[in-house]
């Protein structure tokens, strides 16, 4: 397996995570996570539901603060930034939430323009121009600008969310399950838009996904997170780090079962856990 986690001097990491741990109460979600993402890379984070993928994504933008360890963006230790400084850095991110997270009471145009109005001083005509340009970029006609999110299909809402994420010309794009709930064709449309976004805007991308088609098509690097509660005490939580082709050839049975969608041992574990809870006669 190639070591893709070490950035070269010519390509310093845009994101760097060092020995990070995240706990919520007594629940250990992330443990000893180390990750370095060079500029321009497209990284897919895969793993079972509840293993900590989205939590990791949120630590990258400072929405979740690690219990211990360090998260850096462009060299800044996010834990050391004030709220004002952190807000200033977040302008450099674009985030596409799993459910699109559009404001239901706002029109499409107002949703896409929201970051501009919060962080820039642009004229109404310039804002409209930028909004229409971003909508066109994701394949939406001008006519949607006055519609409310409830009037749109799931795929259209995802594209509006992408347009909003791009409106501030981010350096780093983060996608949380971007194809969840979409049919195969619309999922591929979103995959193509993510590829186009990376190529046209020269952005770094981090994609949390269960969709192996997305991981293979969009990413040039894949890491897999394994649930902490199913690891040995000293075992690393990132059980795979390599290219999509290396993922297909990986010999780790846990990785193969996930990639192939095979319940196998997981089903047996669930059955055993259920049996252990049954009252003794």
Region spans (language model):
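Conserved catalytic motifs of ABC-family nucleotide-binding domains
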Residues: 169
């Amino acid at each position: 397996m190639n070591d893709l986690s070490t950035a070269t001097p010519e390509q310093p990491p845009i994101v760097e995570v060092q020995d990070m741990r995240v706990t919520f109460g007594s629940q250990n979600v992330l443990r000893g996570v180390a990750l370095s993402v060079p500029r321009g890379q497209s990284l897919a984070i895969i793993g079972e539901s509840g293993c900590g993928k989205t939590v990791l994504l949120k630590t990258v933008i400072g929405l979740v603060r690690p219990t211990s360890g360090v998260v850096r963006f462009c060299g800044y230790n996010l834990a050391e930034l004030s709220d004002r400084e952190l807000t200033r850095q977040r302008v450099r991110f674009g985030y596409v939430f799993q459910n699109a997270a559009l404001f239901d009471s706002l029109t499409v145009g107002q949703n896409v323009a929201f970051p501009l109005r919060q962080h820039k001083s642009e004229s109404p005509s310039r804002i409209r121009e930028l909004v229409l340009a971003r909508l066109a970029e994701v394949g939406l006609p001008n006519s949607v600008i006055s519609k409310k999110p409830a009037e749109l299909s799931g795929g259209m809402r995802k594209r509006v969310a992408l347009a909003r994420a791009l409106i501030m010309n981010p350096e780093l794009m983060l996608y949380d399950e971007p194809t969840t709930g979409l049919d195969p064709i619309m999922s591929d449309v979103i995959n193509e838009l993510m590829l186009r976004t990376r190529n046209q805007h020269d952005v770094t991308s981090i994609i949390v996904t269960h969709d192996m088609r997305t991981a293979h098509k969009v990413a040039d690097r894949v890491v897999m997170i394994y649930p902490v509660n199913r690891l040995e005490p000293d075992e690393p939580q990132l059980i795979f780090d390599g290219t999509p082709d290396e993922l297909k050839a990986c010999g780790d049975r846990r990785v193969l079962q996930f990639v192939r969608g095979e319940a196998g041992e997981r089903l047996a574990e669930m059955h055993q856990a259920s049996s252990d809870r049954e009252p003794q006669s």
